């Protein structure tokens, strides 16, 4: 592993060069600026190579690339931003004054600060391990997120263009336009629900958080995106719902520190520290290191802690994702029918709020499992929801969540054991063969997700075909369910991408871009990536395999998937 100090300085250099490029582009052609930053970046990498050696320089290089491209550099200059604002005003757009209070920023700094402190303590006192790189990635991401939040707080402007019926959100980092014709739901909260908005407390893509105070918050649900903002109390928002606006009731949101939110706060923090990140593991390792506890005991405790987290994963995620039991009287008979046929009448079905279309199973075994659907998924036709539920029911019945975690643990354990034994056997030779060691390590990194994909895709294909046996329509209904799911998701993604405001040249290029459907057979390279490295086979193949085979699961279908996995990964 590379030196922690060098790793942090590399991230700083990446940030610095990114900002340097941003400022120099105001006076110099972009090509010259990129050449200059490339020379400076290569110079830093060469310095690290001479100081750290070949193997340690490789992760340093990726740290540099990540920090350079993820740095919070504005998308536009202030001049370009002002041009957009002036153009909106010339067109008669009305500015919506925002309520601003630094308390909102302090909450983000408080939440992020807890995880940043854990990372810093590990950097200072923790042992040298791969966790260092994971924490550094999280550290950089949090710093970038905080920087963007500060800039958003300082410079965000909202406009409503009445002639277009479009809401504009204008900032240095991005400018978006939201047509009110895509607005499906409006609600008002007494304050922003920061436990829902903070980036580490969400499993899905983060919401568009434009909140700049702890006051009354408007939540707008557009196709593919949910937007939150805090207008000044003096602003009239009647344009959003016309006559219905006066009939709306405010949704009361308690402060995050309120007694009623303690369970949510703890659950979301635990989720961020154990599921979405490694903060809890890093904190324990740092504590054990300071106490002088040896690596063997530390490793045993970490494994037991991982097993414990797997065991309580259903309860943690239920709290962290604010799940609620589905009580729709139209859906309850469908749920009862599907899960009774699967022999799983005791499994609870929940809904979690998200703009994505998705469903997933949670839990270490049948007795502690649940199935969750996103709020957008519940808007699909009932026949499609039935197919999604049948797919997830098979995951629960076959204990796929538990098996997937155990297989991942087993694969990583075998790789580490193999590396350790190989190093012990050829230690003297390996110390003089750094190129071989480097290539071998990257081959293992390359093959690990491929092996994992092999098992997870088999589980997904099995869930499709066995799930079809729970449906009245069999394979045809399951294929139709997946098709509808993809069509809705693709449409939402297209709408979300269309909210970005670009300059005329960029708009011309975007118009020429071909829209790619998830149901269409892609080029061989992307098919190769999906079949060999992703957890799910490509959707076009899943639908096709259902449409061209009989309902049921057999050795023949395993052979079909196995052959397609390699045949479809080859050039046409």
Model-derived segments and their meaning:
Residues 152-154, 170-228, 354-370, 378, ...:
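Non-transmembrane, membrane-adjacent beta-strand/coil modules in membrane-associated proteins
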Residues 421-425, 431-456, 463-466:
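C-terminal structural cap/anchor segments
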Residues 86, 155, 161-164, 235-282, ...:
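Polar-ligand-bearing catalytic/cofactor-coordination segments
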Residues 2, 17-39, 43-127, 225-227, ...:
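N-terminal membrane-targeting/pre-transmembrane regions
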Residues 138-187, 327:
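Conserved beta-hairpin
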Residues 44-47, 116-132, 280-297, 412-431:
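Juxtamembrane "helix exit" motif at the C-terminal ends of alpha-helical transmembrane segments
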């Amino acid at each position: 592993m590379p030196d922690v100090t060098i790793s942090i300085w590399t991230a700083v250099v990446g940030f610095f060069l990114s900002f340097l490029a941003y400022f120099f582009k105001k006076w110099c052609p972009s090509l010259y600026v990129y050449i200059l930053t490339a020379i400076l970046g290569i110079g830093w990498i060469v310095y690290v190579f001479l100081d750290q050696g070949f193997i340690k320089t490789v992760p340093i290089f990726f740290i540099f690339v990540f920090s350079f491209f993820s740095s919070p550099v504005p998308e536009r200059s202030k001049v370009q931003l002002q041009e957009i604002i002036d153009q909106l005003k010339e067109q008669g757009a009305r500015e919506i004054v925002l309520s601003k209070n630094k308390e909102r920023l302090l909450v983000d700094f408080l939440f992020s600060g807890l995880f940043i402190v854990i990372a810093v303590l590990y950097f200072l006192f923790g042992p040298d391990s791969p966790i260092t790189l994971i924490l550094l990635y999280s550290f950089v991401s949090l710093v970038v997120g905080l920087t963007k939040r500060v800039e958003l707080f300082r410079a965000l402007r909202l406009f409503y263009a009445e002639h277009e019926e479009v809401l504009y959100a204008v900032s240095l980092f991005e400018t978006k336009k939201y047509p009110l014709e895509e607005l499906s739901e409006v609600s008002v909260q007494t304050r922003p629900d920061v436990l829902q908005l903070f980036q580490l407390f969400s499993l899905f893509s983060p919401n568009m958080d434009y909140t700049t105070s702890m006051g009354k918050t408007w939540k707008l649900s557009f196709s593919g995106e949910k937007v939150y903002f805090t207008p000044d109390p003096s602003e009239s928002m009647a344009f959003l719902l016309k006559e219905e606006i006066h009939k709306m009731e405010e949704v009361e949101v308690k402060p995050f520190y309120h007694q009623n939110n303690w369970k949510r706060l703890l659950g979301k923090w635990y989720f961020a520290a154990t599921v979405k990140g490694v903060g809890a593991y890093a904190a324990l390792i740092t504590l054990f290191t300071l106490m002088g506890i040896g690596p063997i005991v530390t490793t045993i405790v970490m494994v037991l802690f991982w097993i414990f987290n797997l065991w309580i994963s259903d309860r943690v995620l239920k709290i962290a994702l604010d799940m609620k039991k589905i009580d729709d009287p139209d859906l309850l008979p469908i749920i009862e029918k599907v899960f009774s046929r699967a022999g799983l009448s005791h499994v609870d079905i929940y809904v979690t709020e998200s703009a994505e279309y998705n469903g997933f199973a949670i839990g270490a075994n049948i007795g502690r499992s649940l199935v969750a659907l996103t709020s957008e998924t519940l808007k699909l036709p009932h026949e499609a929801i039935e197919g999604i539920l049948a797919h997830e029911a098979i995951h629960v019945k076959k204990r796929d969540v538990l098996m997937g975690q155990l297989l991942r643990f087993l694969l990583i354990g075998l790789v580490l054991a193999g590396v350790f034994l190989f190093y012990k056997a050829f230690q003297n030779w390996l110390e003089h063969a750094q190129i071989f060691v480097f290539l071998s390590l990257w081959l293992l990194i390359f093959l690990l997700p491929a092996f994992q994909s092999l098992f997870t895709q088999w589980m997904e294909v099995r869930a499709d075909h066995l799930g079809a046996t729970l449906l009245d329509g069999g394979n045809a209904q399951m294929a139709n369910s997946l098709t509808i799911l993809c069509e809705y998701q693709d449409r939402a993604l297209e709408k979300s991408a269309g909210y970005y405001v670009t300059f005329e040249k960029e708009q011309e290029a975007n118009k020429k871009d071909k829209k790619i459907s998830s149901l269409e057979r892609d080029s061989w390279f992307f098919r190769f990536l999906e079949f060999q490295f992703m957890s799910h086979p490509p959707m076009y193949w899943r639908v096709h395999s259902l449409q061209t085979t009989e309902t049921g699961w057999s050795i023949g279908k395993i052979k079909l998937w196995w052959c397609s996995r390699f045949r479809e990964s080859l050039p046409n």
